[in-house]
């Protein structure tokens, strides 16, 4: 194939200041994809390890702001959004004063990303967790398993995020 005609997939990654987003961006760079990172900070604020993610394009994005999500995803116009942004402090999610914030990020923010992806016909990769299950199963988990049983606010919020994406 003539290199002049090869297409470079553009991928927007949310939550690049976190471990998963950081690693996804570095993997995209290794594979030659065009990666654009996003996080709530106006500049990359994750691990300063000198890896590719520290110099790749990044945009500020509060995923709980539906208008901002639509604007950024429309402007970036990615082929794919890998949604790594989330409230991940599992134990703190149980605090009464944190529950609304957890839901705003993990459910409403995820819904905002899904809606914007649909509007620009971008694929969306959603990262969930095993916390959507209670850990009591005795058989290997199957990809289409619906035996959800979250035991925590965090687990419920990630399940609700999954359902938002699926719908």
Question: Can you name each region flagged by the protein language model?
Answer:
Residues 14, 38, 81-85, 124-129:
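SDR active-site strand-loop-helix element
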Residues 51-65:
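Rossmann-fold cofactor-recognition segment
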Residues 120-122:
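A short helix->loop->beta-strand "cap" motif at the edges of active sites that frequently abuts
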Residues 63-105:
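NAD(P)H-binding glycine-rich loop region in Rossmannoid oxidoreductase-like domains
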Residues 33-45:
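Conserved glycine-rich Rossmann-like NAD(P)H-binding loop of the short-chain dehydrogenase/reductase
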Residues 100-112, 132-167:
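Catalytic helix-loop patch of NAD(P)-dependent Rossmann-fold dehydrogenases
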Residues 9-31:
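N-terminal Rossmann NAD(P)H-binding glycine-rich loop of SDR-like oxidoreductase domains
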Residues 23, 27, 116, 164:
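Rossmann-fold NAD(P)-dependent oxidoreductase module
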């Amino acid at each position: 194939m003539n290199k002049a005609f090869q297409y470079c997939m553009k991928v927007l990654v949310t939550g690049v200041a976190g471990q998963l987003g950081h690693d996804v961006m570095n993997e995209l760079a290794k594979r030659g994809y065009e990666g654009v990172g996003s996080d709530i900070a106006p500049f990359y604020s994750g691990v300063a390890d000198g890896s590719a993610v520290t110099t790749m394009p990044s945009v500020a994005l509060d995923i709980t702001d539906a208008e901002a999500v639509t604007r950024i995803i429309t402007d970036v116009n990615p082929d794919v959004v890998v949604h790594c942004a989330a409230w991940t402090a599992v134990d703190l999610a149980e605090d009464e004063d944190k529950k609304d914030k957890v839901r705003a990020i993990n459910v409403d923010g995820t819904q905002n990303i899904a809606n914007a992806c649909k509007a620009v016909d971008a694929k969306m990769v959603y990262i969930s967790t095993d916390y959507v299950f209670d850990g009591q199963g005795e058989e290997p988990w199957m990809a289409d398993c619906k035996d959800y049983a979250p035991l925590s606010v965090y687990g419920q919020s990630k399940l609700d995020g999954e359902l938002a994406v699926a719908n």
